[in-house]
């Protein structure tokens, strides 16, 4: 049976992650309170950020920036701003 969590991003009960995907205390917080759906949405934003800002994961400052954006997105309800990106209209 799938594990459920109260997702802080979706603000509802949803299927939880299968295992901890991020190290440390932040990783535990993500595992305990972020759903698969929210994590999937974050991964899309993360990919856009890395590509548009040309982030290098070997650079500690770039990793710190990405981690802060992740916390803002998943836990603080702040959308990721990518300069020049206009989301498609429905």
UniProtKB/Swiss-Prot annotation:
GO terms for cellular component: cytosol. InterPro entries: Fe_traffick_prot_YggX, Fe_traffick_prot_YggX_sf. The keyword Iron applies. GO terms for molecular function: iron ion binding. The keyword Transmembrane does not apply. Could be a mediator in iron transactions between iron acquisition and iron-requiring processes, such as synthesis and/or repair of Fe-S clusters in biosynthetic enzymes. This is Probable Fe(2+)-trafficking protein. It comes from Haemophilus influenzae (strain PittEE). The lineage of its organism: Bacteria, Pseudomonadati, Pseudomonadota, Gammaproteobacteria, Pasteurellales.
